[in-house]
Amino acid sequence: MSTKISSTLSIWTFGIGPAGTGKTYLAMAMALKELIAGNVERIILTRPAVEAGEALGFLPGELQEKILPYLTPLYDAMNDMMGKEQTMQLVERGIVEIAPLAYMRGRTLANAFVVLDEAQNTTHEQMMMFLTRLGDGSRMVITGDITQIDLPRAKQSGLKEATRLLKDINGLQLFHFDGQ
């Protein structure tokens, strides 16, 4: 499946499936492949700050320190592929950027490979805002598990809505992962 996805990478690629199917790992592999090939200048990692317990603002530390625990699966994948030292060098040089979804409004993400992980926890408004951040020379991979939505019951998942509304859009690919 990885070869098929990598060789047919679209502007927007959605990877949807249950936990443990490799969505996050493949997204990072695709991002690093594009970076190493010189097709993008940077990798931007984001996800919604939604959880069952404390809110992001109540965690100690600066913004980057607060968002880091949410992005651990992405860092784990990078560490596995490149080693921790090289991963940290890319972060320190700004080639890999942590960007909280809440602060994306107004940005244009050009020449970047953008990974939105855990997208099932975006609202409709967050997803539409995110999808419109794409700038020249960029690609987005959006991953999520629609069986693990942690939004309040009154909110609909932006991932579910986006895939339903955009499934026939040119330049968008939708991959469904399963446990097999």
Question: What is each of the regions a protein language model found here?
Answer:
Residues 2, 11-116, 120-180:
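Conserved helicase motor core of SF1/SF2 NTP-dependent helicases
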